[in-house]
Amino acid sequence: MTKDIMDAVFIKEMAKTTSNLYRLGWDERNGGNITYLLDEKEVAEYLDVKQIIRTIPMDFDGKKLAGKYFLVTGSGKYFKNVEEAPAVNLGVIQVSEDGKAVHLLWGYTDGGLPTSELPAHFMSHIARLSVDPENRVVMHCHATHLLAMTFTHELTERAFTRTLWQMCTECLVVFPEGVGIIPWLVPGTNEIGEATSEKMKENRLIVWPHHGIYGAGQSMDETFGLIETAEKAAEVYTIVMSQGGIKQAITDEQLKALGERFGVEAKAGYLNN
């Protein structure tokens, strides 16, 4: 006999995280999406993995994820509603063996579908798993100050990263590889997924100019914290600029010392010698 899936840690984590993202104003309306890679063992505690509710075609070759299970936010769903109605707003899916569809095992009880950004998420999972087999979460949101920075700050990865590192001491420690930036592209397309996943091979944070940010990590907390840290730095930058601009900041020598103390290495070429 299976357990009640509402008691599953992964459902509770997703509900708590989506509520926090909405509360912070980073996922207005139906903005934002999360995919959470699950182990078959943890899914089987709550669901009959052979019981397929329906099969949903996918316009993307997901064969590299064949057989894998994911908890996914729904297309057009509001994050503010997840905690009260998980079964409507979330779905547990399994990628088909040919990678051309996903099987719905639970959720989307109103006939809903996985997020329209599923290709970008799946491509990002493939990219991250190739460099970090423990990666489980891909998260997209519209973090306010990071989004604002894409209108006012130079959009080169080195310059953008350096500004974030200089705004909060913890930033270099949390994302020493820096942030990736892609061009503005139409959301929900394979094109934006391909651009994002290419950057995901080296970065866990990818900025979508004038749109939002993608983050990846080994857990829900790690991924949320990664975005949260970068967003805090962007907020500080916004306040600093409104107060008249930067008069002093963390120096490159100090950033190097920080990296040495915490055992991380800044991305090559990002610090001045």
From Swiss-Prot:
Subcellular location(s) per record: Cytoplasm
EC primary class: lyase
Cofactor binding remark: Binds 1 zinc ion per subunit.
Catalytic residues identified in the record: E117
Gene3D superfamilies on file: Class II aldolase/adducin N-terminal domain
Pathway given in the UniProt record: Carbohydrate degradation; L-rhamnose degradation; glycerone phosphate from L-rhamnose: step 3/3
GO molecular function: aldehyde-lyase activity; metal ion binding; rhamnulose-1-phosphate aldolase activity
Reactions performed catalytically: L-rhamnulose 1-phosphate = (S)-lactaldehyde + dihydroxyacetone phosphate
SUPFAM superfamilies linked to this entry: AraD/HMP-PK domain-like
InterPro entries reported in the protein's UniProt record: Aldolase_class_II_sugar_metab (IPR050197), Aldolase_II/adducin_N (IPR001303), Aldolase_II/adducin_N_sf (IPR036409), Rhamnulose-1-P_Aldolase (IPR013447)
EC number: 4.1.2.19
Residues reported in the UniProt entry to bind Zn(2+): H140, H142, H211
Gene Ontology cellular-component annotations: cytosol
A Gene Ontology BP annotation from the UniProt entry: rhamnose catabolic process
Keywords of the record: Cytoplasm, Lyase, Metal-binding, Rhamnose metabolism, Zinc
Required cofactor(s): Zn(2+)
Record family assignment: Belongs to the aldolase class II family. RhaD subfamily.
Protein's name in the database: Rhamnulose-1-phosphate aldolase
Organism of origin: Listeria monocytogenes serovar 1/2a (strain ATCC BAA-679 / EGD-e)
Lineage: Bacteria, Bacillati, Bacillota, Bacilli, Bacillales
